[in-house]
């Protein structure tokens, strides 16, 4: 599920450069990024361990990336809930965070669809198991008078399984994955626009801080020049200097300094707040990227399960086609017997993984909404 080339060209260079700089400047973001890299490296290592067939299974890949997505989503939630400044007054930021967790809601919708598919697949498993039980029972039976077809009940159950079809077939999941892709592309564009707004605000504040320093320097210079002028003109000598300089310092230098110092502190506080906004926005951006990876892997996993079930359907076809050939039927049903437990295990694990993942994302989302809406 790759992002469009135009969008990548629009976002990647500036955003990655800004992200790198932000990590170098902000300790918390640097720590967040370091933990993210560590988890990613661990995930890559686990996915590159080859099994005896020379590749990592789609199911294992899903389990690793699903765990990774949960950790990143929780990381984004933790980062946001730790922020205590008034950064949530920034509506652009608030909208961005809400948009991110709206994106995770779309992911939950996909997982719910997969859960429904898993339930249907489990119903199919019951029919397969019943067919296998009948197979064992009918294998021990003697054919009475040549009139009773052996494995008749077995084949009835297999036909029922075939009639159910493939629970992962159709366009439902494909359509939802396309929806999540478009949602993510739209969200990345929003991230890009929000970054620009935040950077403009920071730039303006930095300019204001510079101006206050210039004003302060000019005021100080006026006082200094006035003092020099007093001495140079010899007005009142030291006593006269003191009489004129003291009011100037009190009304000018000290007053300007105090005013500008307060203003500078206020501006710096706002600037730090906006820099924290950038940190949050960067962590949200990372969350989007990882969310995309995880949903892509769910797609791979679904393809894997779909292939397994289609293989089972072919075996069922084989058994039905050879119902008059006892030896061929036995061979096919034996193959089904070997495959059914593996398939059942995979389907169960997928269901449990998706359910756990959904709960964790929903919990993280609730934490964030409570934080920014209080």
From Swiss-Prot:
Compartments where located: Membrane
Key words of the record: Coiled coil, Membrane, Transmembrane, Transmembrane helix
Alphabetical list of Gene3D superfamilies matching this protein: 1.20.1170.10
InterPro entries per record: DUF677
Annotated Gene Ontology cellular component terms: cytosol; extrinsic component of cytoplasmic side of plasma membrane; extrinsic component of endosome membrane
GO terms of biological process kind: cellular response to water deprivation
Lipid bilayer topology: Multi-pass membrane protein
Pfam families reported in the protein's UniProt record: DUF677
Domain of life: Eukaryota
Keyword Coiled coil found: yes
Name of this chain's protein: UPF0496 protein At3g28270
Origin species: Arabidopsis thaliana (Mouse-ear cress)
């Amino acid at each position: 599920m790759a992002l469009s080339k135009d969008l990548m060209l629009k976002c990647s260079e500036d955003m990655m450069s800004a992200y790198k700089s932000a990590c170098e400047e902000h300790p918390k973001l640097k720590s967040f990024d370091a933990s993210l890299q560590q988890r990613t490296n661990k995930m890559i290592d686990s996915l590159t361990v080859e099994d005896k067939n020379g590749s990592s299974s789609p199911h294992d890949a899903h389990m690793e990336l699903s765990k990774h997505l949960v950790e990143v989503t929780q990381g984004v939630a933790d980062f946001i809930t730790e922020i205590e400044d008034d950064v949530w007054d920034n509506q652009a930021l608030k909208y961005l965070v809400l948009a991110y967790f709206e994106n995770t809601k779309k992911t939950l919708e996909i997982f719910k669809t997969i859960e429904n598919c898993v339930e249907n697949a489990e119903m199919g498993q019951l029919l397969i198991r019943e067919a296998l039980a009948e197979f064992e029972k009918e294998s021990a039976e003697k054919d009475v008078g040549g009139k009773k077809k052996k494995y008749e009940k077995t084949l009835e159950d297999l036909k029922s399984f075939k009639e159910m079809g493939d629970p992962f077939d159709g366009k439902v999941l494909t359509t939802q994955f396309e929806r999540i892709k478009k949602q993510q592309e739209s969200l990345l564009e929003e991230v890009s626009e929000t970054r620009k707004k935040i950077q403009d605000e920071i730039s303006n504040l930095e300019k204001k801080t510079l101006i206050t320093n210039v004003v302060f320097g000019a005021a100080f210079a006026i006082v200094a020049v006035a003092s020099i002028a007093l001495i140079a003109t010899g007005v009142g000598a030291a006593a006269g200097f003191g009489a004129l300089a003291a009011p100037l310092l009190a009304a000018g230098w000290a007053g300007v300094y105090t005013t500008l110092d307060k203003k500078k502190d206020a501006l710096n506080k706002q600037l730090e707040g906006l820099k924290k906004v950038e940190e949050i926005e960067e962590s949200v951006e990372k969350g989007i990227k990882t969310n995309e990876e995880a949903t892509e892997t769910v797609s791979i996993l679904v393809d894997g399960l779909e292939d397994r079930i289609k293989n089972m359907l072919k075996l069922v076809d084989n058994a039905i086609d050879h119902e008059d050939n006892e030896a061929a039927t036995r061979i096919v049903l034996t193959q089904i017997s070997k495959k059914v437990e593996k398939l059942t295990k995979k389907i169960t694990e997928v269901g449990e993984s998706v359910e756990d993942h959904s709960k964790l994302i929903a919990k993280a989302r609730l934490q964030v909404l409570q934080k920014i809406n209080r």
